[in-house]
């Protein structure tokens, strides 16, 4: 199935039905009084997150989604039927934005999360509501309210714990296929990966994490060059970035240090927040470097690159060093979760002070 991570749709809710202006008509009851029912509520348009969907392709072609109008009220105090709601199933990770106002309507981050995109109009009142002691035969009624109409932008940002960065042919796809159940296309030419791939890494029977592989970046990606800039948004939800560098490029004229710097520069241009995320350096293709030259090659790279963060040396093809990297990632993600849990459990001192002041005021009163 083709991967589509952006779409624009129009959500049109149903109008409310009109209220009825009618009067009770029965034998031997010449002045039966008003009995007009209310109009039905217009149908609403909802979105629900579904983990079984991984693309927005359905919304690339079906752009208009219209809910039914509510039925008009009738005599004998009959209310109009409500319009049927419609529900749009979207991938988990979809960000929904109102194109006219720029308002973020919803961020669907959990399976089953449901949100209203366009609310149906309220049904109008029938003349039964206007009966009073001075107006025994009201002829006024209220028309239904129009439903909401919105132009929406849908952006899919995949939910992953770890994101892979690197130049084309750095070995990202080989790496994710080695450590996870993902099976991306692997070939010896640039831009083999054309869309994001997700892989679940099983550390043991109880622990796992998700890795996202995006198309390789090239210099100028933030301005639109290559493919990667289209998919950098998929790394915004990750907790850790792995910068994979080809330590032994096929073309000897290519400098791995210059390529690594180019990737970091593109990241900074695209999004400062993404640039500030925790980032580890992963030197790949050790199998292409003779064992007696590895230490010197790595030392020279780190000296020229001036990198002081975590460094891992691997061969995605043979699996050398991959297991150690997996366990380090697991420990890092566990530490992040522990910090988040501690932050949630920490009491709000400001709230305690307010409660103390309220209690003291009550005692003095």
From Swiss-Prot:
GO terms for molecular function: GTP binding; GTPase activity; magnesium ion binding. Keywords: Cytoplasm, GTP-binding, Hydrolase, Magnesium, Metal-binding, Nucleotide-binding. CDD domains: Obg (cd01898). The keyword Oxidoreductase does not apply. Residues 160-334 form the OBG-type G domain. Its cofactor is Mg(2+). Pfam families: GTP1_OBG, MMR_HSR1. It is found in: Cytoplasm. GO terms for cellular component: cytoplasm. Residues 1-159 form the Obg domain. GO terms for biological process: ribosome biogenesis. Its EC number is 3.6.5.-. PROSITE patterns: G_OBG, GTP1_OBG, OBG. The keyword GTP-binding applies. Mg(2+) binds at residues 173, 193. GTP binds at residues 166-173, 191-195, 213-216, 284-287, 315-317. Belongs to the TRAFAC class OBG-HflX-like GTPase superfamily. OBG GTPase family. Monomer. An essential GTPase which binds GTP, GDP and possibly (p)ppGpp with moderate affinity, with high nucleotide exchange rates and a fairly low GTP hydrolysis rate. Plays a role in control of the cell cycle, stress response, ribosome biogenesis and in those bacteria that undergo differentiation, in morphogenesis control. HAMAP family: GTPase_Obg (MF_01454). This is GTPase Obg. It comes from Cupriavidus taiwanensis (strain DSM 17343 / BCRC 17206 / CCUG 44338 / CIP 107171 / LMG 19424 / R1). The lineage of its organism: Bacteria, Pseudomonadati, Pseudomonadota, Betaproteobacteria, Burkholderiales.
């Amino acid at each position: 199935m083709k991967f589509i991570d952006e779409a624009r749709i129009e959500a049109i809710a149903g109008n409310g039905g009109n209220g009825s202006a009618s009067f009770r008509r029965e034998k031997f009851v010449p002045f039966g009084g008003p009995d007009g029912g209310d109009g039905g509520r217009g149908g609403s348009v909802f979105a629900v997150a579904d983990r079984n969907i991984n693309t927005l392709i359905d919304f690339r072609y079906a752009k208009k989604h219209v809910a039914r109008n509510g039925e008009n009220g009738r005599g004998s105090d009959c209310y109009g039927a409500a319009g049927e709601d419609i529900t749009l199933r979207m991938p988990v990770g979809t960000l929904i934005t109102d194109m006219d106002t720029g308002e973020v309507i919803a961020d669907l981050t959990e399976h089953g999360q449901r949100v209203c995109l366009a609310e149906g109009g309220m049904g109008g009142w029938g003349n039964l509501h206007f009966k009073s002691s001075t107006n025994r035969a009201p002829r006024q009624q209220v028309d239904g309210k129009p439903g909401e109409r919105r132009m929406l932008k849908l952006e899919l940002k995949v939910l992953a714990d770890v994101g892979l960065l690197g130049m084309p042919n750095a070995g990202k796809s080989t790496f994710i296929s080695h450590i996870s159940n993902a099976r991306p296309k692997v070939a010896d030419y640039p831009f083999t990966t054309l869309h994001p791939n997700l892989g679940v890494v099983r550390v043991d029977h109880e622990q796992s994490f998700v890795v996202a592989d995006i198309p390789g970046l090239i210099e100028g990606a933030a301005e639109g060059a290559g493919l990667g800039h289209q998919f950098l948004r998929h790394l915004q939800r990750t907790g850790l970035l792995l910068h994979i560098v080809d330590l032994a490029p096929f073309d000897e004229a290519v400098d791995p240090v210059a390529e690594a710097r180019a990737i970091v520069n593109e990241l900074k241009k695209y999004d400062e927040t993404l640039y500030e995320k925790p980032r580890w350096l992963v030197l790949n293709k050790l199998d292409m470097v003779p064992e007696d030259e590895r230490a010197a090659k790595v030392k020279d790279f780190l000296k020229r690159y001036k990198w002081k963060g975590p460094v891992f040396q691997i061969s995605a093809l043979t699996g050398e060093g991959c297991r150690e990297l997996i366990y380090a990632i697991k420990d890092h993600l566990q530490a992040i979760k522990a910090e988040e849990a501690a932050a949630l459990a920490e009491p709000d001192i400001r709230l305690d002070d307010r409660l103390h002041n309220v209690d003291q005021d009550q005692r003095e009163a």
